[in-house]
UniProtKB/Swiss-Prot annotation:
Region (Disordered): 148-244
Chain ranges of the HTH cro/C1-type domain: 19-71
Highest classification ranks of the organism: Bacteria, Pseudomonadati, Pseudomonadota, Gammaproteobacteria, Enterobacterales
UniProt protein name: Cytoskeleton protein RodZ
Recorded superkingdom: Bacteria
Length: 335
């Protein structure tokens, strides 16, 4: 009867209480049990108070309770029903794979990096395109402005061409005028001999004159033909005497055009030797004081010779830009 009462009383006690009572009967402290089982004192205390640490797996907790039961001489079979309540088996929480999470974060970071790279690339391409378009537009505007200026200057030159031709004609007339007095003098000298009226016949002049007196009168009378002989024999000035072959200027600038091209040439004194549009298959010969400053709208459409040597314009043709260069006395074109 006492045995059954004791058995019922043991069943009423929890697993932790039975282990604590057994420990106290053996005179062991919690520190001694913890040292023998190689556990923490807090773990032994939690077992006796029927607490299940959240950070401790149920499998380990059941193992600690069994070791504690063997230490205090309690059969494990008597504690099994209480173990199911105190330390039920729980599914272990499997932590997510660290490598997978790291790979996912790395992939996300790589995606952002790739997006940023493409964005920078698009910005660079856009800026390059905008810069090229602005440069091209500026060149076109400059060519248009130069063409307008050349047209205006060409119109001014055409309006001034008539007075220049008149002055040239006047100079030529003045050059030929000195020959007129000579011819007029000769004509006037000869005119009295031809148009002089015949004198009236005087009865006294019909008388016979002695031969000696006739000779004296003949010698004293000047011969009209003798006065005209020097004028007729004198050579008249001709235009061929005034024509001279001009010497070749060592600073001459020769240009041949294979297409329509706008051009402006200025010499060292600042004088514009030419400014305007040249047509295809045209040529231009200019002379002035070196160095020359040239501004060419289409470098590929012109071939330049200076001092008998061709001028290299390949660097302007490759870049398709308006050529600005200076030709000095040593024929070293510089931009």
């Amino acid at each position: 009867m006492n045995t059954e009462a004791t058995h019922d009383q043991n069943e009423a006690l929890t697993t932790g209480a039975r282990l604590r009572n057994a420990r106290e009967q053996l005179g062991l402290s919690q520190q001694a049990v913890a040292e023998r089982l190689c556990l923490k004192v807090s773990t032994v205390r939690d077992i006796e108070e029927d607490k299940a640490p959240a950070d401790l797996a149920s499998t380990f907790l059941r193992g600690y309770i069994r070791s504690y039961a063997r230490l205090v001489h309690i059969p494990e079979e008597e504690l099994l029903p209480g173990l199911e309540k105190q330390a039920p088996l729980r599914a272990a929480k499997v932590a997510p794979m660290q490598s997978f999470s790291l790979g996912k974060r790395r992939k996300k970071r790589d995606g952002w990096l790739m997006t940023f790279t493409w964005l920078v690339l698009f910005v660079v391409i856009g800026l390059s395109g905008a810069w090229w378009w602005q440069d091209h537009k500026a060149q076109q505007e400059e060519i248009t402005t130069m063409a307008d200026q050349s047209s205006a200057e060409l119109n001014n030159n055409q309006s001034q061409s008539v007075p220049l031709d008149t002055s040239t004609t006047t100079d030529q007339a003045m050059a030929t005028t000195p020959t007129s007095p000579v011819d007029t003098t000769a004509t006037n000298t000869q005119t009295p001999a031809v148009t002089a009226p015949a004198p009236a016949v005087d009865p006294q002049q019909n008388a016979v004159v002695p031969p000696s007196q006739a000779n004296v009168d003949t010698a004293a009378t000047p011969a009209p033909a003798a006065t005209t002989t020097p004028d007729s024999a004198a050579p008249l000035p001709t235009d061929q005497a005034g024509v001279t072959t001009p010497a070749v200027d060592p600073n001459a600038l020769v240009m041949n055009f294979t297409a329509d091209c706008w051009l402006e040439v200025t010499d060292a004194t600042g004088k514009k030797l030419f400014s305007g549009m040249q047509r295809k298959d045209g040529n231009l010969n200019l002379t002035g004081q070196a160095p020359y400053k040239l501004k060419i709208g289409a470098p590929a459409a012109v071939q330049i010779q200076y001092q008998g040597k061709p001028v290299d314009l390949s660097r302007f043709i490759r870049t398709n830009q308006v050529a600005r260069l200076t030709l000095n006395a040593e024929q070293s074109p510089a931009q």
